[in-house]
Amino acid sequence: MKSKLLGNVLIVGALVAGSALAADKTNPNLPRTDADISKGVQHEMLTYPYYSIFDDISYKVQNGKVSLYGEVTQPVKKSDIHNIIAKLPGVESVEDNIQVLPLSDNDNVLRRQIAASIYRFPTLSRYGAGTHPSIHIIVNNGHVTLTGVVDSEADKNVATIRASAAGLSFGPINNQLQVVRPSRT
């Protein structure tokens, strides 16, 4: 009888301790590591519904401080992103270095022309698949910058050629695409 009672007490104790440990992982009052915060920022950026191929946001997390960088096409995106990130558990402060691109009909036309030229081209069309296309097109007063990720140096070069041929940009295309070879698993 005593051993059965002791066994039940141990099981209940283990369940209580286990649920307390599980609660600790979701408790927003607990300190978060920079890696935890970074995962949260990445998740929020991937699920932000208004982030488009014409916006580009990057971030850095250090000691609970999130620094945001990049360009967006609308002021509401800048404030939305800032507010969303500021509410993440563990975030101490947000340094907002996001630039709002000027409103320009000419830039909007150029964005659409370049997007069509890149994403309708057979060797680059795969980068437009899914909810988050990997090539971003930033147009600031006619100056074009390509950001994001491609699989090969050839795709990076083709994207530059397609962007150059698409419209009347002011100056050369600033190609900041990163080449990341896909894993073969």
Language-model regions, residue ranges each:
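N-terminal targeting leaders
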Residues: K2-I11, L15-T185
